[in-house]
Amino acid sequence: MEAWYRKGSIVAVSFNHTIIFADDKQESASFFTKLFALPEPVAWGPFLSAQLDHGVFVQFAEPGIEIQAQHYAFLVTEEEFDGIYQRIVDAGLPHWADPRMAYPGQYNTNHGGRGVYFRDPSGHNLEALTAPYA
């Protein structure tokens, strides 16, 4: 084990931002902010940025290459989940209770909370959950 790693220690590291590749950044950023009831995305350089809690940003960019689907999970409150799930249903979005998509049109009640999986316009697998899995 390398010297910089100390088992059991927690280092003061915070997550700041990530970039999600999109076929159409405006479409993906708008989908994301509407579904999660966030402020409208803001342009910053080549990105459209959506602000989350604790100063975290999700930035959408168009890389000009084929998009490889990724998984992004977002921890939300029970009240926020209610709104998100209702917006998914109202929009007629396909959604699942599990990442294998074996339980369509449902949400799960794993780990003492609720969770739902769905896809964004570029095919990324998004998840909204109310209790962390780990």
Language model features: what each stretch is:
Residues 2-26, 71-72, 132-134:
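N-terminal beta-strand motif that seeds the catalytic metal site of vicinal oxygen chelate
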Residues 12, 19-58, 64:
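Core segments of cupin and vicinal oxygen chelate
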Residues 12-14, 65-69, 109-110:
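Short glycine-enriched loop/turn motifs at secondary-structure junctions
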Residues 17-19, 49, 57, 71-73, ...:
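Short aromatic/hydrophobic contact patches that present stacked aromatics
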Residues 28, 32, 72, 88:
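Hydrophobic pocket/interface hotspot
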Residues 58-61, 117, 126-129:
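Conserved beta-strand in the GNAT
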Residues 62-67, 133-134:
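A short, sequence-level motif marking secondary-structure junctions
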Residues 73-121, 125, 133:
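Vicinal oxygen chelate
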